Amino acid sequence: MIYAAAALMVFAGCNSNERPTPELIITLADFPELEHIKNVQGAAVCGDLLFSLQDQGWCNVLDLRTGKPVSQFPLASQGRNNHANVAFFGSARYDSSDRFPLLYVSQCKSQPVTEIGLAETDSLSRLLFVERIITDDRGIPGGSELVQIITFEPKQWNSRLWFADSRNPKDLWCYGNIVGNEKPGNRIVMQKFAFPEFSADRFLLELTEEDILEETYFDALMPEGHRGPQNAILQGAFLLDGVVFMPCGTGSEKHPNELFYAKLDGSKYGWFDYTDIMPVEPEDMDIWGDRIICPCNTDSTGVVYSFPYRKLIKAML
């Protein structure tokens, strides 16, 4: 009875009249000066700047106040096997004079990035790249330096991606599919680590299962049988105020654009289906003031949507 009631409440929370309406704020195709406008992936916000990453490790820096590009450059980890799937800023800076904290980028792919010096036979893959953002004399970002790579080799995982709390990154979370996107028996596992203290003297940082502080499954935060990201195409992840958000799908009828959410204590859970008003592939999320920023893909260009964060929280159960 408890599960049935909860499921009915969640369904009500997914009603199109209850969900907050997203706003399209940037279309990359509007800016001919941008060299790459497709295949957007991870995203991280620092101040008023959105660092919008693309497959293979390209970065477009966009001013969220004006909606216009600031700069563009390849990441130091750029390579054909760097999907740059999820991104976030940590709290540490490489040097105290740096304008930006270190940027963390999930590789996602299972093949090594040979462009950074790894051999094609190297076992180091699905890495977390740590990038130092390089700026010019005006403080404009124009490149990056790969200052660390973090590796974790769990025994029974199909994929490995990373996220941290957007406002207080004291913990590092590794998450991914146990079996694979939309496959029978799939689950989304999330494992928590203490956020590694950055040291310039330690380029390769290896995490082990002994370092795991906590493990949970996203579907375990929901009633049994409830639809969750384990049933969808997994994209990025975003943690704020104890709530994990996972945008999923491609925006099609077969693979709907769904935003799943669950509070880590299990007290809130559910999803919003945005396919009818946002028929795009959502990729990643970060917070900007009281807005959630979400870069997405259409067939022809990358776009950026904005969600009202407080209204989203209020609409949750």
Language model regions located:
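Structural signature of eukaryotic scaffold interfaces centered on beta-propeller domains
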Residues: 36-46, 83-102, 153-174, 230-240, ...
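Conserved blade-ending motifs and adjacent loop-strand segments that build the rim/top face
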Residues: 268-289
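Loop/turn-rich, solvent-exposed surfaces of beta-rich toroidal or solenoidal domains
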Residues: 215-264
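Blade-loop segments of beta-propeller domains
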Residues: 67-111
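Structural motif
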Residues: 57-61, 111-132, 171, 180-195, ...
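Surface-exposed loop and turn segments in beta-propeller and other repeat-based domains
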Residues: 25-34, 73-85, 130-158, 197-230, ...
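Beta-propeller domains
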Residues: 46-80, 252-256
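Beta-strand-rich domains and repeat architectures in extracellular enzymes and scaffolds
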Residues: 28-57, 235, 245
